[in-house]
UniProtKB/Swiss-Prot annotation:
GO terms for molecular function: rRNA binding; structural constituent of ribosome. It comes from Mycoplasmopsis agalactiae (strain NCTC 10123 / CIP 59.7 / PG2) (Mycoplasma agalactiae). Belongs to the universal ribosomal protein uL3 family. HAMAP family: Ribosomal_uL3_B (MF_01325_B). This is Large ribosomal subunit protein uL3. Keywords: Ribonucleoprotein, Ribosomal protein, RNA-binding, rRNA-binding. The lineage of its organism: Bacteria, Bacillati, Mycoplasmatota, Mycoplasmoidales, Metamycoplasmataceae.
Amino acid sequence: MKGILGRKVGMTQIYTELGQRIPVTVVEVKPNVVSKVLTVEKNGYFATQLATVEKKAKRVNRPLAGQFIQAKTTPKQYIKEIRGMEGYELGQEVNASIFSAGELVDITGISKGKGFAGTIKRWNQHIGPKSHGGGGGSQPVRQTGSLGDISGNRVVKGMTMPGHLGSEKTTVQNLEIVKVDTVNNLLLVKGSIPGAKKSFVIIKQAVKGLPTKEAIKLVNVKEVVKMNELIEKAKKFNIEVTVGMTSAELEPLIHKAEEEQAAEGDK
């Protein structure tokens, strides 16, 4: 098991070499610090506690401050342990390089809060009949039909009723990593993930153990823009541009044509 703590930045879209548009979520994964190592002998299970995002020392209580001192790091804001993650030492840094494009991950976060909601929005119940006796004062169309059996004399635990919707721990499984940017500490994940922008998330290796997918080949936007500029120049010199030609192959031909043109001008 491996994992890392991150922060949701937002959603965008990218393109593959075949022109397919893919919606992705950008997750900022600044280097995490191993703040505690849990073992079976001492704790009854093994896990690795990670911490990320700096926090003012005056806002940290003494037990946590002592824990950070042992790890030889500064106080952190977001602390979570990942069970089954082993092989790391106290104070060691964990960054985005532990993942690669094509891997499947499970992402856990706090879902967006939506306030008080009725049973139709909260539990996806059906709207009642709007005619033939339904929709009257005694039978509103959006009200739950029944709260239970007449003989029970109570409402059983777990009955779907109106209440607060969202703002709860949510996990989405088997999300594909499209790109890993170790320079900017970013992960691009295919699809949406729980939580609002700037909310913290836990990214873990997928527990279902599905096979890793082949990495999606993304279009290089800089290369495409540069190639378009070179093609326009090549047209002026009647240079033949073939399918699959790269800017590295086309650029020398254009330079050669420009030098020949300059030499003819000097004559």
